[in-house]
Amino acid sequence: MSDPVYIVGLDIGTTKIACIVGEKMPNGKIEIRGYGKTDSTGVKRGMVFNIEETVDAIKRAVAQASEQSKVDIKSVNVGIAGHHIKSLQHRGVLIRENADVEISNEELDKLKQDMYKIAISPGEEIINVIPQEYIIDDEPGIRQPKGMLGNKIEANFHVIVGQTSAVKNIVKCIEHAGLEMENMILEPIASASVFMPSIVSLMTSSKLM
């Protein structure tokens, strides 16, 4: 049997900080293994205003989830919200040199990475880029184009943008709590992962930067 795959989510909210540990099953579903929750006193409207209090709350929530799940938590996927978060819609295009060669993961990744280069307002940074659909030679509605043939790959992306200082403060809290950041993801999307395994796949494969 292969080693279990665990996904850890951390919600840094205004009223509470919660940590949840899920095990990814062979069928793609997630089974909850542990949960921890503490009061949040260092966060207001999705922004950290007291580093020390927030770090302490993160440590306590993670410790509870770790004890309940019997999992040594070293990294987390952080759900974020707040007035400083906004989302943009962008389309990427890649013209291929050889239409008879199968579309590769490298090409799809290039389309995605190009989204991190789009122009945004000063003081903001791109938190995450989520592919919504692919268009191959003007044929829309394609979810997974890997292995297909075509001259042109297009993709519609959901680009999540946040205030740089707010994002850095969250990352700082995670690091001071002795954890690594796997992903930062918009809370409604993180909530949808409970029902959509494809979002869970995104959380385990997509990196913050």
Question: At which residue positions do the language-model features occur?
Answer:
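Nucleotide/phosphate-binding catalytic cleft detector across ATP-hydrolyzing
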Residues: 1-16, 20-208
